[in-house]
Amino acid sequence: MTALTDPTKGDGMRTLVTGGAGFIGSALVDRLAHAGHEVAVVDDLSTGRLENLADAFASGRVQHTEVDLAGPDLAEAVAAARPEVVYHLAAQIDVRRSVSDPLHDARVNVLGTIAVAKAALEAGSRRLVFASSGGTVYGEPDPSALPIDEHYPPGVTNPYGVAKRSAEDYLASFAELHGLEPVSLRLGNVYGPRQDPHGEAGVVAIFCNRLLADEPVTIFGDGRQTRDYVFVEDVVDAFVAGGEHPDAPGARLNIGTGVETSVLELYQALREVAGFGAEPAFAPARPGELARIALDCAQAGRVLGWRPKADLADGLARTWAWAFQEVNAGSVGG
């Protein structure tokens, strides 16, 4: 098997990014367009913003189609793009909503993934890189096993994790039956520029927005719950490698840092970057949330040659600088 592109020759390819107007998706679109690839963005704009694609549109290599993943127009949009590689990032990402409305979560995260895979096959796509969840597919891990690798058995903590694991398995069946090349990236808690401060899964963005608005920061639970925070540009590196590396097909890979950071430690680190910030308020813990998680990402290094580059201090500084600029421009907050 050969790589899909030879970056030394500047070969472009046809790509498609679902959720490409969102936080991670738009960063990936920027990278692909800058590398000379044609990018079709499929996004229903329920949470994504076309403003995130302003620079990508200026390249002349990016087009957007507003499509519901589970709707009848998806196959036509994918067929029109004829992508060699599909990057599937569109998702329902709110763990709390998966608990309160598991039918909606399954419709988007399971049926939507099946629909994307089917459309990709029909369009002649060779590879599909899927945004899975390293924070939920393993359930509540044994603390003594942290950081956990991909051999850790799957567990059940919330419907979101169940849906992501089911989607991975469906993609594996498409590989077995139809020859699709799936790559599932089990992401840690991704943060960075363009993350929605009004969303449900972006604690760094929420904290930045609260600090900049001089509003109190609320931490759910005692703040000692840990996450593996990974910077968005490092995650984009992993997606690009997943789409191009000859050894990637069939892999299910953790993408994180291997470092546990508590919510309290995260907030303190952000206060140090900002240079100000009051003590947080506390509220009851939310159902379905993990107590601790950290991901062993050595396998991603072996398969993709990937490793995270940004440590938490650097990533938070870059995220804070972006959020500060956006507030001054009137784009964030309110």
Predicted segments, located by residue:
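Amphipathic terminal alpha-helices
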Residues: 2-4, 312-334
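N-terminal Rossmann-like NAD(P)+-binding domain of SDR-like oxidoreductases, especially those catalyzing
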Residues: 2-190
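Hydrophobic "lid"/C-terminal helical patch
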Residues: 28, 239-243, 267-270, 297, ...
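Residue-level signal for the nucleotide or nucleotide-sugar donor/cofactor binding architecture
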Residues: 48, 100, 108-111, 151, ...
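Conserved mid-core alpha-helix of short-chain dehydrogenase/reductase
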Residues: 115-119, 229, 234-241
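Glycine/proline-rich active-site loop of Rossmann-fold NAD(P)-dependent oxidoreductases
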Residues: 165, 190-206, 215-216, 220, ...
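C-terminal "lid/loop" region of Rossmann-like NAD(P)-dependent oxidoreductases
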Residues: 222, 250-253, 261-268, 275-292, ...
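Non-catalytic, hydrophobic alpha-helical segments
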Residues: 235, 239, 255, 266, ...
